[in-house]
Regions:
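Extended catalytic core of nucleotide-activated donor transferases of GT-like folds
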Residues: 6-8, 45-129
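Short, solvent-exposed loop/turn segments at secondary-structure junctions
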Residues: 11-14, 25, 41-46, 81-85, ...
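Donor nucleotide-sugar binding/catalytic pocket of nucleotide-sugar-dependent glycosyltransferases
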Residues: 117-171, 178
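N-terminal pre-catalytic "stem/leader" segment of glycosyltransferase-like enzymes
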Residues: 1-72, 215, 226
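Short beta-strand segments
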Residues: 6-9, 37-40, 77-80, 161, ...
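Nucleotide donor/acceptor-binding cores
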Residues: 2-3, 90, 187, 225
Length: 242
């Protein structure tokens, strides 16, 4: 009998975490070592229609109609940000993209320490967790704070790079791209990312500042490159597009 694995992830979401989750689920299914059940969760307000009824039937068949199990999973895999990690299995694995900066919050470190293993996609992300260090403080009766220890990552963390489907992502004939005719520059930078909420400088990807710095950096260059932004907002709605 196969061991029971419960995967908590936004597998139906059209998002980066959704793509990552689907890649991992397909890999688990291909190895065929576990009886896999999926707890599909939302990812913000992104659409939850990423699965194809025919092509992704093996994934859809694993999705639980309700987030409950008759028995405790042998392995629980949580593919989200660390503050959402739970420990529902006999063995608990947290898989996260981490953070774009070097500052990992104490809340994330605390939750990672509840897992048996943490997996991230890059050495940069791993370094952020490994090097994070916070002082544990205790409130004294006189109102002062006293250091009682340190908070740091104490559980194993491994890097599992995000692979590429070469059937999809491959060199193509530039003549098949209508966009090429609109780009007069010889060199172009491409940025792909969700343009989040907030005013200038508040978007987590900081795309507005990217545009500003791009203009400033190449303003006085004789041969200026192009900047291509492939972006979207969370809800994909007509109102957002307008």
């Amino acid at each position: 009998m196969k061991k029971l694995m419960l995967i908590c992830a936004p597998v139906t979401s059209r998002s980066g975490y959704g793509d990552h989750a689907r890649d991992l689920v397909r890999a688990f299914l291909k190895h065929d070592k576990f009886d896999i059940k999926i707890w599909d969760v939302n990812w913000g307000q992104t659409p939850r229609n990423a699965l194809d009824g025919e092509l992704d039937k093996n994934i859809i068949d694993c999705i639980l109609p309700e987030p409950k199990m008759d028995s405790r999973p042998d392995v629980y895999v949580d593919i989200r940000i660390p503050n959402e990690f739970q420990t529902l299995g006999k063995i608990n694995i947290g898989i996260t993209a981490g953070i774009e900066t070097t500052a990992v919050s104490s809340n994330w470190i605390d939750n990672c320490n509840k897992m048996d293993l943490v997996i991230v996609p890059s050495e940069h992300s791993k370094d952020g967790f490994v090097k994070a260090l916070y002082e544990k403080m205790q409130q004294l009766p006189n109102g002062q704070q006293q250091k009682v220890g340190e908070l740091k990552l104490e559980k194993p963390i491994e890097v599992l790079f995000e692979g590429t489907d070469e059937n999809v992502y491959k060199p193509i004939d530039n003549s098949s791209l209508n966009l090429v005719d609109d780009i007069k520059e010889d060199f172009a930078f491409l940025h792909v990312g969700l343009w989040g909420a907030g005013n200038y400088g508040e978007d987590r990807k900081d795309i507005a500042k990217l545009v500003k710095i791009f203009y400033e950096s190449f303003a006085n260059k004789k041969e200026q490159p192009a900047l291509i932004l492939k972006s979207n907002q969370a809800t994909f709605s007509i109102l957002d597009r307008e």
